[in-house]
Amino acid sequence: MRLERLNYNKIKIFLTLDDLTDRGLTKEDLWKDSFKVHQLFKDMMNEANTELGFEANGPIAVEVYSLQAQGMVVIVTKNQDADSEDDEYDDDYIEMQVKLDESADIIYQFHSFEDIIQLSESLQRIGITGGTVYHYDGQYFLSLEDLGSHTAEGVVAVLAEYGNPTTLTIYRLQEYGKLIMDGNAVETIQTHFS
């Protein structure tokens, strides 16, 4: 579980599939109202309080984004007036609005373009030639949409050898990142860099 403070009232939590499995949960379980899900949320809020000083007092909004074969991104936003209204809420009660979204893209982050060149050889060997490469905040990102007949888990296993899953969405990369290669990145890299 990775935590990141986005601003005073908002945090982002990245849960890997291993984090969920360790707690006996699947991605599908998160959409259910169960004791395990409540315990996971309580653990996340306790860790956010310990690591970031983020106290979830009062009403909060929870946005859950499912990243295909990578895990989940949970964005928690507390009401800006929550600190002044602490008396109105019971300690064990948190009012939540939940927004759910699932991304079809698999996005991985790489420290150098050389990592993507090496990865592209492995991807082309298994028949994947598409993909889009972005540069953002000193890092490279590869987004894959069409996996052909391959399972997302199989492709993620190859991607994980060269890079790391990211919590950035495709929308952020499209808006703020620099587009390096569009559509057939793996094939283009193999043509020009092998």
From Swiss-Prot:
One of its GO terms (biological process) is negative regulation of establishment of competence for transformation. It comes from the Bacteria. Signal peptide: none annotated. GO terms for molecular function: protein-macromolecule adaptor activity. It holds the Pfam family MecA. Enables the recognition and targeting of unfolded and aggregated proteins to the ClpC protease or to other proteins involved in proteolysis. Also involved in Spx degradation by ClpC. Acts negatively in the development of competence by binding ComK and recruiting it to the ClpCP protease. When overexpressed, inhibits sporulation. The N-terminal domain has binding sites for ComK and probably for unfolded/aggregated proteins; the C-terminal domain interacts with ClpC. PANTHER family: ADAPTER PROTEIN MECA, ADAPTER PROTEIN MECA 2. Homodimer. HAMAP family: MecA. This is Adapter protein MecA 2. It comes from Bacillus subtilis (strain 168).
